[in-house]
Amino acid sequence: MVFAIPDGICYCFVAFVESSLSQHKNLGKNMATQKIIYTAVDEAPALATYSFLPLLQAYTKRAGIVFETKDISLAGRILANFPENLAESQRIPDYLSELGQLVRLPETNIIKLPNISASIPQLKGAIKELQGKGYAIPDYPEEPKTDTERELQARFAKVLGSAVNPVLREGNSDRRAAASVKRFGRKNPHKLMKPWPSDSKSQVAHMTDGDFYGSEKSVTVNNACNVRFEFVADNGPITILKEKTGLQAGEVIDAAVMNVRALRSFYADQIERAKNDEVLLSLHLKATMMKVSDPVMFGHCVSVFYQDVFTKHAEVMKELGVNVNNGLSELYTKIGNLPDAKRAEIEADIQTVYKTRCELAMVDSSKGITNLHLPNNVIIDASMPVVIRDGGRMWGPDDRLHDTIAMIPDRSYATIYQTVIEDCRNHGTFDPATMGSVANVGLMAQKAEEYGSHDKTFMAPGNGMIRIVDDTGKILLAQPVKKGDIFRSCQTKDAPIQDWVKLAVNRARATGAPAIFWLDEKRAHDKEIIAKVKRYLANHDTNGLDIRIMPPVEAIRFSLARIRRGEDTISVTGNVLRDYLTDLFPILELGTSAKMLSIVPLMNGGGLFETGAGGSAPKHVQQFLMEGHLRWDSLGEFCALVPSFEHVSRTFHNEKAQVFATTLDEAIGTFLENQKSPSRKVHELDTRGSHFYLALYWAESLAAQSRDPELQACFVPVAHALRENEAKIIGELNGAQGQPMDIGGYFRPDRKKTARAMRPSATFNNIVDGM
């Protein structure tokens, strides 16, 4: 069987000889169904796949396991959404929709690598690249004026932000550091921690009124129904914002509003405060996942900070169609076509702002790229842990670390970061060699909470009321709004809550650690969830378990105290805190969140195994393109494969799959012990070399085991060949570095060029492919 591979996708051939199936009839169910789906994604993990997937396919063929790829990259999703614009040979299936169906099947087994959660600038960049490759994809209409353009914008919205995860996450999340990773982290603590001065001026700033937290209303519906979202203007007319949304019996639905006048006032106050305190100003949002609300909040900050520029040049900005939601970068791009004198005038006015305002935190000080250049450059779940790790500081225009006011406008989750800052100021930095762990059980199934709110988030078209009305005409929730206010509604279904509670009890039982539900009874949504948690906990045997419900600030104080004593805790949280905490604690503990084990037990019995939480690492790609060195650490992929193989073993009674799981886990331990993760420096071990060492240690473990003599006999010569040629292979891999790489594209690289770049060792390739 050969899987067809569309050109330009990070795919590798899956060749599986049908006749070999007859040799393994004792493995249980039909071999053709013993499939692991390996997602084809973007940027650094996509490049790493070219090196690692052929190895997986070669090693596991004898277990009757087929690795099949599904393209969920940004470029792939764009192409799948516009088949009518493409020639037959250019079309690809809508793999994301396929996966959305597969996650409901009990045998489904998916390795999910990080993909781009696209901002509008990234979307436009991908479209431009595809157009340059001959794909007739239309331009993205930022300000649609016709029905056709509005329809086009809605189609592109399907690939913006975190379009992938809500589709795949048909289960709740179990995230923790693998035991081997934790042992290694304590024995070899990372050295990224910087001291916390007791006189640090750094702090989190949040709104005190007018935010989502303060306005939130929530209700649980008793019976299944349909609701509509409508805007009732002060002068009477009613506009339907969303015609129909289905609610299940027992579902929780919320409505909250961000008052943009209060938001802008908050920004202005913090700008002055940062200047007076002589600290950096930084903004921390999630414009990728919260793809409707947060870019608008980001844009308001841009327009307030650069208010003098936008006021003075208002007519020019309007003519150019500058959208502040895309950041200062778009302004620079669009003024590039102005006459030199006018462009220079605007650029000079921007520099004047920097002289009169507070200093901004920088993304790249050498290039003058600030926190406000692009909405996706500073993402809260990744940025705030680094602020804390770096002693409460961020990089300034002088390329040095400085204290910062970290603006997180909404109170719902901002307070947890301020609590960590206070803890560090009082007790000093954390010690990775002794600190405990905080695992997470996260409520995320079926688009739970804020991360499923995109299609129910609206900018108020005027002054009036936005309300949620059921099909009998009953008003469930209503929120007063002013023009431009951000209205957001979230749904949380009952079955995922029941599953979440069960998973929390199971993890508490398995570990003996306290399990803390982070829920705030003063918050409308959490009050509804608390009632359900108490009800469903009563369905489980909790004798001997320490299970508590605490507001987030109390919960994080409790967890931090245990961390400093070297004790482990389970955080049981909603969807957003799941995202934030599974970056925060691993970055402090291990130096990165990419080393986390992330298991999603799908609600119908399948398994989704996510490979870390560190994003798709565009800076790694930049280094690879410049000097042929890729520093992506595939440890997340390695760790995810262990429970994936175990799932195959359980589902199909495949003993060989369990052998692969056991030996891979042993190999990961050896890999960590020998410190074979990629270096950051060119001509040293990179991603490809780390894959070689995983292959070597895994082959040696398979050769040493006696549980499966057939696999042992197969891997004895492989292990010998890899060990015998170690120096030669590493020489070939490292020797390929040190020069610019041409892979024929960024968002959709050329498959053949990338395969050559990522598999430069003929010796290694011959051993693997010869299997």
Annotate each PLM feature.
Residues 10-12:
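Cysteine-centered motifs
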Residues 19, 24:
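Cationic, low-complexity basic patches in intrinsically disordered or flexible, solvent-exposed regions
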Residues 32-299, 308-532, 536, 540-558, ...:
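Extended, well-ordered protein cores
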Residues 712-720:
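Short, charged, amphipathic alpha-helical segments
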